[in-house]
């Protein structure tokens, strides 16, 4: 499953940002800023962005930690990391970001290394959610927070029907037009498999996070899991 998802993200790298725009009706930038704030990253911090994709969240973290801080952006898609590098090279001043090709289930970092962390649209796609949360817990410093943003199936039946209609009538046809129909077919099954908010809280607590809170946004079609390590 990991190799399959990795291949999907390598193939969709050229239109990855458009995908987020389509899925979020262009609102993902607002939600990413919310996630960065919930991570409590501060000037001078060493921060981590998991499943960094094309680098949008990592660049926002870099602005937050400033010139005296440092950010590590991690993804298993070499194509997306290349896009992220190109984006960061166009920034002025140059952000202090290291782009790392790695699996979030086996992070190449020391214990207690990071002051803050984010993950945007990644947890839903990992093969082993408890393992990824365990790794996140391991690399965070005591007292650090992480904010995990992702799409969800809303509990409201009408909103759930609207979400599925939108996927079927807009996102899939556009993907088909771009020749990426099979690549986008994973979205609905991934939403169906993804644990709901209270289940995410329980998983976070099981791996050692002292505090875990889930904030539904966009009428439950989106959510942010905020966790703290003590």
UniProtKB/Swiss-Prot annotation:
Highest taxon, organism lineage:
Bacteria
Report the top EC class in one word: transferase
This enzyme catalyses: demethylphylloquinol + S-adenosyl-L-methionine = phylloquinol + S-adenosyl-L-homocysteine + H(+)
Determine if Zinc is one of this entry's keywords: no
Pathway this chain belongs to: Cofactor biosynthesis; phylloquinone biosynthesis
Single biological process term from Gene Ontology: phylloquinone biosynthetic process
Which CDD domains would you find in this protein's record?
Answer: AdoMet_MTases
Q: InterPro entries from the xrefs? A: MenG (IPR032904), SAM-dependent_MTases_sf (IPR029063), UbiE/COQ5_MeTrFase (IPR004033), UbiE/COQ5_MeTrFase_CS (IPR023576)
Q: Name one Pfam family in it.
A: Ubie_methyltran
Keywords, in A-Z order: Methyltransferase, S-adenosyl-L-methionine, Transferase
EC no.?
A: 2.1.1.329
Q: What does this protein do?
A: Methyltransferase required for the conversion of 2-phytyl-1,4-beta-naphthoquinol to phylloquinol.
- In which family does this protein belong, per the annotation? Belongs to the class I-like SAM-binding methyltransferase superfamily. MenG/UbiE family.
Protein's name in the database: 2-phytyl-1,4-naphtoquinone methyltransferase
Q: Which organism is it from?
A: Nostoc punctiforme (strain ATCC 29133 / PCC 73102)
Identify the coding gene: menG
């Amino acid at each position: 499953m990991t190799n399959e998802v990795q291949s999907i993200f390598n193939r969709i790298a050229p239109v990855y940002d458009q995908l987020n725009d389509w899925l979020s009706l262009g609102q993902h930038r607002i939600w990413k800023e919310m996630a960065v704030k919930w991570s409590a990253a501060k000037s001078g911090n060493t921060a981590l962005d998991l499943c960094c994709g094309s680098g949008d969240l990592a660049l926002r973290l870099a602005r937050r930690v400033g010139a005296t801080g440092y950010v590590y952006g991690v993804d298993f898609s070499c194509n997306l990391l290349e896009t992220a590098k190109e984006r960061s090279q166009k920034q002025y001043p140059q952000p202090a970001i290291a782009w790392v090709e790695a699996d979030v289930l086996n992070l190449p970092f020391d214990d207690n290394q990071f002051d803050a962390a984010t993950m945007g649209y990644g947890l839903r796609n990992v093969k082993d959610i408890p393992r990824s949360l365990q790794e996140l817990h391991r690399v965070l410093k005591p007292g650090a927070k992480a904010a995990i943003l992702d799409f969800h199936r809303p509990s409201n039946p009408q909103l759930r029907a609207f979400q599925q209609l939108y996927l079927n009538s807009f996102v899939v046809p556009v993907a088909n037009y771009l020749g990426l129909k099979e690549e986008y077919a994973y979205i609905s099954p991934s939403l169906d498999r993804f644990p709901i908010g209270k289940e995410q809280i329980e998983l976070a607590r099981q791996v050692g996070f002292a505090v875990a809170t889930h904030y539904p946004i966009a009428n439950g079609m989106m959510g942010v899991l905020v966790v703290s390590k003590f």
